């Protein structure tokens, strides 16, 4: 694996103040490097964005050039995903919910499968 495949991780943010720190830490700590991070603030009324921005400033400032934060009025999950998709510039996109978390090598495993199979779409089970 040579990090030649680019991935955009798209995460709508709405009402996840209690989950956003663990989620963002897991996403921004991926072992794979060629990632664009797109966080879509879907008009959340809680402190989700403050927590996210604080985490980026304190722990992930070295990734700021790879992070896009898009603010929009609340339109629901499909509209937020579409907004993120419109902003994505990578070869592949990965939609993830902001109350979930990723293992440190999740994206690497996805890219390994893309390279192994030359797939356009990769589908996999989630661990609960």
Feature map (PLM): residue ranges:
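Nucleotide-sugar donor-binding/catalytic module of glycosyltransferases
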Residues: 1-128
């Amino acid at each position: 694996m040579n990090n030649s495949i680019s991935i955009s991780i798209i995460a709508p943010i709405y009402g996840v103040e209690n989950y956003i720190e663990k989620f963002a830490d897991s996403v921004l700590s991926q072992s794979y490097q060629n990632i664009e991070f797109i966080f879509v603030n879907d008009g959340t009324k809680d402190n989700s964005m403050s927590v996210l921005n604080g985490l980026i400033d304190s722990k992930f400032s070295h990734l700021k050039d790879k992070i896009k934060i898009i603010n929009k009025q609340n339109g629901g999950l499909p509209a937020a995903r579409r907004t993120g998709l419109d902003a994505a510039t990578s070869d592949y996109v990965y939609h993830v919910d902001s109350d979930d978390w990723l293992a440190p090598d999740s994206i690497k495993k996805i890219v390994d499968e893309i390279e192994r199979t030359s797939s356009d779409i990769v589908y996999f089970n989630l661990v609960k």
